[in-house]
Swiss-Prot record:
It is found in: Cytoplasm. The keyword Cytoplasm applies. It holds the Pfam family Methyltransf_30. This is tRNA 5-methylaminomethyl-2-thiouridine biosynthesis bifunctional protein MnmC. The keyword Methyltransferase applies. One of its GO terms (cellular component) is cytoplasm. In the N-terminal section; belongs to the methyltransferase superfamily. tRNA (mnm(5)s(2)U34)-methyltransferase family. Its main location: cytoplasm. Residues 271-675 are annotated as: FAD-dependent cmnm(5)s(2)U34 oxidoreductase. GO terms for molecular function: flavin adenine dinucleotide binding; oxidoreductase activity, acting on the CH-NH group of donors; tRNA (5-methylaminomethyl-2-thiouridylate)(34)-methyltransferase activity. It catalyses: 5-aminomethyl-2-thiouridine(34) in tRNA + S-adenosyl-L-methionine = 5-methylaminomethyl-2-thiouridine(34) in tRNA + S-adenosyl-L-homocysteine + H(+). It comes from Pectobacterium atrosepticum (strain SCRI 1043 / ATCC BAA-672).
Amino acid sequence: MANLPIQHASLSWNAQGTPVSQQFDDVYFSNQDGLAETRYVFLQGNQFPERFGTHPRTACVIAETGFGTGLNFLTLWQAFAHFRQQQPQATLRHLHFISFEKFPLRQHDLAAAHAQWPELAEFADELRQQWPLALPGCHRLILAQGSITLDLWFGDVNVILPELDDTQNHQVDAWFLDGFAPSKNPDMWTDNLFQAMARLCRKEGTFATFTAAGFVRRGLQQAGFHVSKVKGFGQKREMLSGLLPDTLPITSPTPWYSRPAASTTDDIAIIGGGIASVLTALALQRRGANVTLYCAESQPATGASGNRQGALYPLLNNRHDAVSRFFSLAFDFAHRSYSALAQQGLEFEHQWCGVSQLAWDEKSARKIEQILQGEWPEELVVSVDAQQLEKQSGLNPGVNGITYPDGGWLCPAELTAAALKLAQQNGLSVQMSTAVSALEKTDSGWALTLSAGQQVNHAVVVLANGHHITDWPQTRHLPGYAVRGQVSHIPTNPVLGQLKHVLCYDGYLTPVSPQHQTHCIGASYLRGQAHGDYREEEQQENRQRLLNCLPNADWAKTVDISDAQARQGVRCALRDHLPLIGAVPNYEQTLKEYENRLHPQHRADTVSSAPYWQDLFIIGALGSRGLCSAPLAAEILASQMYAEPLPLDRDTLAALNPNRFWIRKLLKGKPVTHD
């Protein structure tokens, strides 16, 4: 996917108080009455809100070209909220709005535009509160207590649309074909756009647009739409609306990375007790699923999710590869998600105090230089010198680095426990101290053998049990490995108490936890080890690593580990640093169907979809960045299970597919071996 830096919109304001794009020299909405124009062109043009009451599915998907000020979205949101109040028993319960924007507005420009529509204020305020960073790709916003999903794709719509995953095909119920006038923005109004609209459109899906330009009408007709000219808004003579009478036949370009949905969502079991499992439960519940959670321990977050303080910051590089794309978006989503949970009243220690990554040696300095070459927005990451670092952090590390202003720390153990309590209030059934010793496919789903010997049945199973995800016959070929880590808890003192920023070097040091009056310093990283015992040598190594990395920081010498206070956990990691999200692939069937058949020289004209275990899913291998990746990973998995549009491009989703290691070899004609 193209990852050019996203530029914000440059605005001016005309005599009527309407925002004007300096990039396109065109108004964002009608000088006459923007709100009335939106209701007439896009809502009435697509038979909204009347259509809500007869919609046959629980979710309605609307796509839009050109988010702009968000006026179309906010107006539709208002209409949907009124509909839900008037018809709470209607089939339609969820609105999924997908919009594309090449030049997103800044928050203060949004606020100025939104001030013109007081009746939309409650919706506009919530939108601005969650307004994402200017990063390329999809930003998923969960609004209206989960009843509205907004997927904001930042970038060129004609670049993004061909890179959407196959799961987006035939999903869109209505198109808002907006954007600046074709004469002002000809690069957007192309045959490629119209054909992509048809590909994504559901049978009898509709569209409406303010323009009646002949080439637009002809392009939509050639793409398969039935097009009608109707009276335009206000003084405008004509506009276009229409529908797609039937869906188009589509061949997947990458069937080996298919993402099957769950056959049912009435009965889902999750195996695990950490942050990934609990956030997955919440994501599924928000969609109406019935979920049971099985945790082998007597309390949640006893594994890698159980630390007192964990740093939240992204994993970036200058290549804008799948790692960088995923973690940049995941970081922003995680920050919004955790803030939203806190606003809901969940109690967990956290501070959005910023995180600084230090250039403590030549290798780390080169890495930081490479990150800065990626031209990331300063709201995400900014270069800082030693003097700035001292001012930000309260202590002088004696080195330069970079800062993630929206980063910080939180208590994973408290977050997991609070989120689990919320899920239970929402109807989650929890079985603690209940290990699952066997997993067997049945005609109706899956049979789980529990630790006490009894057997229970569930239609769908999600594996989210950390480094134990490869314990099952169905997952034993997956390449995840265990990594032991020990975090030291050190008492604060007058010097360390001045630290107000998370510092990352060849380890990390957090500000003081007000609750415990300790700092966390860590962590050891022992690949292939899964023991949970305290080790004095690792305690010493945690302190020594700080001293070695920051030899000129006298304050580091005040770190006291003599109390031998620490916590041990075991992570599950992969060599490519990305998690496993999706259906569990069937190893034997993958080799049987794909071996010697995926290399371009031997590939048949048609290739079957990837073999997988039906109704068995996985979210795992989150490694040491689980706080960053877990919220978006859970959202992706829940979306896949519900056959919803997914919030990532095709290539990034492929890089998260649990079968990716085997498929990469098979595509190159190499043998697949299991270590």
